[in-house]
C-alpha cells in the first residue's frame, strides 16, 4: 500500500479560500455603504478621514434677515412672491400704483439687473391695459419694506398708568371710574328729591332760604274726579230735571210714575254734596230726605 506524501497539497483548497475572502470583503463594503446611507438620511455625517470635514459655514443654517418678522407678514410675503398672485393684485389695483405695494424677492431683483432682459415669458392680459408685472419692475423704484406703525402702540389711554413693560408685554393700571350717581366713598346718591338739590324729604325751604322741618317737601295734587256720565247727559238740580223736554209726555199725566222717575234720576246722578267721598273711593249714600221735595205738586194734592 502506498502512503500519501506530506509535501503535496491539493491545489483546489487554496482557490476556494481566495474566492471566499473576496466575497466576504465585498459583502462588508456593501453593508458599510448601506449603513452610511441610512445614517446620512437621519442627519449623521460619515467621513473617512479628518481632512475631509465639511466647513462650518456650510453646516450652519442660512440666517434670516427678518428675525422679528411676524407670521402674518411671512404669509403675506409668500402670497405676494407668487407670480400669479402678484399679477392678480396688480389688476385689482389698476392705475393707482402708489397705493399698491408689491414686495419683490432679492434673488429676482439681482437676476433681472444682471441679465438686463426679463427671464420670463411675457404674459398678455386679455381685455386689460395693465402691463406685465415682470416688465414693470424696471420702471418702478426699489420698494422698501413697510413695517407696522408703532405710533398707536405707545399712546396711553386716559386713566391708564403703565406699571411694567417688556417688549410687547405691558402691564397697565386702570383707575376705577365712578358713575354719575355714586360718590367716591361708594355710597349711591339719591336724585329723587326734585329741584331741592339733594334735600331731605323732611326739610323744606321757606322764602328766606332757611330750611324748615316738619313739612313735606313734595306736595302731590289729587287728581280731579272725572264727571259722571249721568250728570253730563241728564243735568239735575235739586232732584229735578232742568230741561222739561227730557221727560216723556206719556208720563206727565201719572204723578206716581213721574215721582219714581225723579227719584231714580236722583239716585243715578252724583250727589252735589259728596264730592270728597267719591274722590276718596267711598261709596255715596242716597239721601231720601229730599224725596218729598222732588214730588210734583199734583202728587201732594192727591
Curated annotation (Swiss-Prot):
Topology versus the membrane: Single-pass membrane protein
Biased composition (Basic and acidic residues): 148-158, 177-188
Modified residues (Phosphoserine): 52
Location of the protein in the cell: Cell membrane
GO MF term set: collagen binding
Alphabetized Pfam families for the sequence: RELT
Compositionally biased intervals (Polar residues): 277-294
TM segment ranges: 15-35
UniProt GO cellular component terms: basement membrane; extracellular matrix; plasma membrane
Disordered as annotated region, ranges: 47-68, 135-164, 177-212, 247-302
Key words of the record: Cell membrane, Membrane, Phosphoprotein, Transmembrane, Transmembrane helix
GO terms for biological process, alphabetical: positive regulation of cell-substrate adhesion; positive regulation of p38MAPK cascade
Family: Belongs to the RELT family.
Function: Induces activation of MAPK14/p38 cascade, when overexpressed. Induces apoptosis, when overexpressed.
Subunit structure: Interacts with RELT, RELL1, OXSR1, PLSCR1 and TRAF2.
Protein's UniProt name: RELT-like protein 2
Native source species: Rattus norvegicus
